[in-house]
Swiss-Prot record:
Binding-site list for FAD: 8-13
Database matches in SUPFAM superfamilies: FAD/NAD(P)-binding domain
Descriptive protein name: tRNA uridine 5-carboxymethylaminomethyl modification enzyme MnmG
Major localization class: cytoplasm
Binding site for NAD(+): 267-281
Similarity section: Belongs to the MnmG family.
Cellular component aspect of the GO annotation: cytosol
Function per UniProt: NAD-binding protein involved in the addition of a carboxymethylaminomethyl (cmnm) group at the wobble position (U34) of certain tRNAs, forming tRNA-cmnm(5)s(2)U34.
Keywords assigned: Cytoplasm, FAD, Flavoprotein, NAD, tRNA processing
Species this chain originates from: Campylobacter jejuni subsp. jejuni serotype O:2 (strain ATCC 700819 / NCTC 11168)
Subunit text: Homodimer. Heterotetramer of two MnmE and two MnmG subunits.
Cofactor(s) the protein requires to work: FAD
Protein localization: Cytoplasm
Biological-process GO terms, alphabetical: tRNA methylation; tRNA wobble uridine modification
Length: 619
């Protein structure tokens, strides 16, 4: 008997199994190929806009993705660096081979984790409660909790031109039996599609005509636990399609599975295939392609922006029309893949299914796209499954606490009919959810769960103390416009003042940086760089942050008003049939969650609030 069984060894499965095992749960990870644990099936990169936030949040609570990325990274960049700190995002190119080897070895070393190379065929479910798993090897494993992290494997179907192949990924069998079995459980399910780009032999690329894109001169680590971070960095390159490329693609629309009706699943809106881009943006004469090394050896390059399911010979023809690729040799062709997913409104915020007790889902099975979104869900599913075994309160991150909270709340409350990816625009309180304050927001959770060490948490507490001390000093200390103070400001390269101001307003100036902060007062001289950066950020955005915190307090009042788990919405007089139907379907855990459901009116929320408060008084 296991405590937790995790089905699938992708990014969600890695985090789910690691979290459960590290929380002391006897855990089994079932995966089709042990060599492919943690494989980056698509692009060789981790992070990006909003996705970097997810990785930093994972790391803040003790997840693995940030550390693995730092070890396997071959280029590091901060995206949107010229914009505000709320929308900046960390991104790393990774050595794909090294990444999965590190991920696999980290799991194999965990004391409470067993890994078995076999495929789950059927779940053992009794009275709407999962009891275990039966595999393709006829093995039966019983468990208190099961977590599905199946990625694109559920009835996976690969498309290249007119050709179709049942597979979960190239070279790996689709999970047909499990996919068919899930259809019998009465769950709302759908079909989604994603795709991948061709890979090209480096010897066949003329890099001399391509634009170079280097990593940052002073790269920043993803993990706050990474020490002596000094990675070897490789350049990426930028190429461009042209009218000839577009003409080749247009002439073969009739062979594109996307347009022939061969593909039924809905594809990702924000990561379209090249044929979809040419069709949707027919007025554009060129599209950027990002040429990314797959490993530190740089023998193969991933052609980011060139996702396609056109026939093999067409892929070669259209790629060779791009400058620098006239002699390109494709080592691995692009393809589209369709797969089953469970509509995420079937889930609770813990990622447990509402209809099947003790069965959790994480990653692409929930309708998301992206390694980072998958990892975040896997981590939370592993944590909540473990907490449930211990009969402890679940960890449900609020929208004002973490992008992970936004991600899960969006999925569970709003659902999705297309592959969901994270954006900073999805977060109402993104100024509070900066990448670099993730450890301050979430570190205590990781420590309380036993996923962060005493040393790690002490480091976080020191930064929190420095931030509080530094900010209080800036807000309380006033500068008068005398000769001495103005001379000091001029020595820093800052404009003089003409009226009394507190130091926070001076530090909030766009020109004020960390080096100037150090000279402002001896209190800052001994503080570490991380603390100084956060003091600077909090000071610069102080009034905006204060406004967002006030908004959060209003939201908390609604979030704290809990709706009982088996609440009968029909018993509330004054609610329309439509509202009752939606509330019964979504089963919101709080009034705030109910407010996020489309079609739930303010009047209905008022009625519901009054009724629940009255019931609580009676109780």
């Amino acid at each position: 008997m296991f405590d937790v069984i995790v089905i699938g060894g992708g990014h969600a499965g890695v985090e789910a199994s690691a979290a459960a095992a590290r929380m002391g749960k006897k855990t089994l990870l079932l995966t089709t190929l042990i060599e492919q644990i943690g494989a980056a099936s698509c692009n060789p990169a981790i992070g990006g806009l909003a996705k970097g936030h997810l990785v930093k949040e994972l790391d803040a609570m003790g997840g693995l993705m940030g550390e693995i990325t730092d070890e396997a990274g071959i280029q590091f960049r901060i995206l949107n660096e010229s914009k505000g700190v709320a929308v900046q995002g960390s991104r790393a190119q990774i050595d794909m081979d090294k990444y999965r080897i590190i991920a696999r070895n980290k799991l194999l070393k965990l004391p409470n984790l067993e890994i078995s190379q076999e495929q789950a065929s059927v779940l053992i479910v009794e009275n709407d409660e999962v009891k275990g798993v039966k595999t393709n090897l006829e093995n039966i494993y019983f468990a208190k909790k099961v977590i599905l992290t199946t990625g694109t494997f559920l009835n996976g179907l690969i498309h290249v031109g007119e050709n179709k192949l049942q597979a979960g990924r190239v070279g790996e069998l689709a999970s047909v039996n499990l996919g068919n079995y899930l259809q019998t459980l009465g769950l709302k399910m759908g079909r989604l599609k994603t795709g991948t780009c061709p890979r090209v032999d480096a010897k066949s690329i003329d890099f001399s005509v391509l634009e170079i894109q280097d990593g940052d001169v002073n790269p920043k680590a993803f993990s706050f636990r990474s020490r002596n971070f000094n990675p070897t960095q490789l350049p990426c390159y930028i190429a461009r399609t042209n009218t000839t490329t577009h003409e080749i693609i247009k002439n073969n629309f009739y062979r594109a599975p996307l347009f022939t009706g061969q593909i039924e699943g809905v594809g990702p809106r924000y990561c379209p295939s090249i044929e979809d881009k040419i069709n949707r943006f027919s007025d554009k004469e060129s599209h950027h392609l990002f040429i990314e090394p797959q490993t530190i050896d740089a023998t193969e390059y991933y052609i980011n922006g060139f996702s396609t399911s056109l026939p093999y010979e067409v892929q070669t023809q259209m790629l060779r029309s791009v400058e620098g690729f006239e002699n390109a040799k494709i080592t691995r062709f692009g393809y589209a893949i369709e797969y089953d997913y469970i509509e995420p409104t079937e889930l609770k915020h813990t990622l447990e299914l509402k209809k099947i007790k003790n069965l959790y889902c994480a990653g692409q099975i929930n309708g998301t796209t992206g390694y980072e979104e998958a990892a975040a869900q896997g981590f939370m599913a592993g944590i909540n499954a473990s907490l449930s075994i211990d009969m402890k309160e679940p960890l449900i991150l609020r929208r004002d606490e973490a992008y992970i909270g936004v991600l899960i709340d969006d999925l569970v409350v709003k659902g999705t009919k297309e592959p969901y990816r994270m954006f900073t625009s999805r977060a109402e309180f993104r100024l509070l959810l900066r990448e670099e304050n993730a450890i301050l927001r979430l570190g205590k959770y990781g420590y309380d769960l036993g996923l962060l060490s005493e040393q790690d948490f002490t480091y976080i507490q020191n930064i929190a103390n420095n931030l509080q001390k530094g900010l209080e000093f800036l807000l309380s200390k006033e500068f008068t416009p005398n000769n001495q103070n103005n001379a000091f400001l001029e020595s820093l390269g800052e404009d003089k003042i003409s009226s009394i101001v507190n130091l926070q307003k001076i530090v909030a100036r766009a020109s004020f940086d960390i080096e100037k902060l150090k000279k402002l007062d001896p209190i800052f001289e001994t503080m570490d760089h991380y603390s100084l950066r956060e003091i600077l950020n909090e000071a610069k955005y102080y009034h905006y942050i204060s406004m967002q915190k006030a908004q959060v307090e209003k939201m908390k009042n609604l979030s704290e008003l809990k709706i009982p788990e088996n609440f009968d919405f029909k018993s509330v007089s004054g609610l329309s049939n439509e509202v009752v139907e939606k509330l019964n379907h979504h089963k919101p855990p709080t009034i705030f969650a109910a407010s996020q459901i489309s079609g739930i009116t303010p009047a209905a929320l008022d009625i519901l609030q009054i009724y629940i408060k009255m019931q609580k008084k009676k109780a």
